[in-house]
From Swiss-Prot:
<keyword id="KW-0694">RNA-binding</keyword>
<comment type="subunit">
    <text>Part of the 50S ribosomal subunit; part of the 5S rRNA/L5/L18/L25 subcomplex. Contacts the 5S and 23S rRNAs.</text>
</comment>
<keyword id="KW-0699">rRNA-binding</keyword>
<dbReference type="InterPro" id="IPR004389">
    <property type="entry name" value="Ribosomal_uL18_bac-type"/>
</dbReference>
<dbReference type="Pfam" id="PF00861">
    <property type="entry name" value="Ribosomal_L18p"/>
</dbReference>
<dbReference type="InterPro" id="IPR005484">
    <property type="entry name" value="Ribosomal_uL18_bac/euk"/>
</dbReference>
<dbReference type="GO" id="GO:0006412">
    <property type="term" value="P:translation"/>
</dbReference>
<dbReference type="GO" id="GO:0022625">
    <property type="term" value="C:cytosolic large ribosomal subunit"/>
</dbReference>
<dbReference type="GO" id="GO:0008097">
    <property type="term" value="F:5S rRNA binding"/>
</dbReference>
<dbReference type="GO" id="GO:0003735">
    <property type="term" value="F:structural constituent of ribosome"/>
</dbReference>
<protein>
    <recommendedName>
        <fullName>Large ribosomal subunit protein uL18</fullName>
    </recommendedName>
</protein>
<keyword id="KW-0687">Ribonucleoprotein</keyword>
<keyword id="KW-0689">Ribosomal protein</keyword>
<comment type="similarity">
    <text>Belongs to the universal ribosomal protein uL18 family.</text>
</comment>
<comment type="function">
    <text>This is one of the proteins that bind and probably mediate the attachment of the 5S RNA into the large ribosomal subunit, where it forms part of the central protuberance.</text>
</comment>
């Protein structure tokens, strides 16, 4: 029973992800910021969909932070620094099918606080 529930949740998240990706895309000056959340850490990257290139990425494991709100704020601050070095000040936020609540919302708000317009 539990396996079916987890499989259904994953299936629904992937459907949301595809629906979102059909509507948004990024370019070099206005990249798509994609978030992946695992049980232990967060991954965030800026993607140019026109050239299919990752412009910048931050891995939560390398920073030694957990996948909670405090960790999301630290990752977002580091990612904002990386984007500012590359002179990227605005982007499209791709929540990757996750609900905009908790860790994902904290990450987006921290990016905004650090000067990235989403």
């Amino acid at each position: 029973m539990r396996a079916n529930v987890l499989k259904r949740k994953l299936t629904l998240r992937i459907k949301r992800k595809k629906r979102i990706r059909a509507k948004i895309s990024g370019c070099e000056n206005f990249p798509r910021i994609s978030v992946f959340k695992s049980n232990r850490t967060l991954y965030i990257q800026a993607i140019d969909d026109v050239k299919a290139v990752t412009l910048a990425a931050v891995d939560g494991r390398k920073l030694g932070v957990k996948a909670n709100k405090e960790g999301a704020k630290k990752i977002a601050a580091e990612f904002a620094k990386t984007l500012k070095v590359k002179k990227i000040e605005q982007a499209v936020f791709d929540r990757n099918g996750y609900v905009y609540h908790g860790v994902i919302a904290a990450l987006a708000e921290s990016l905004r606080e650090n000067g990235i317009r989403l």
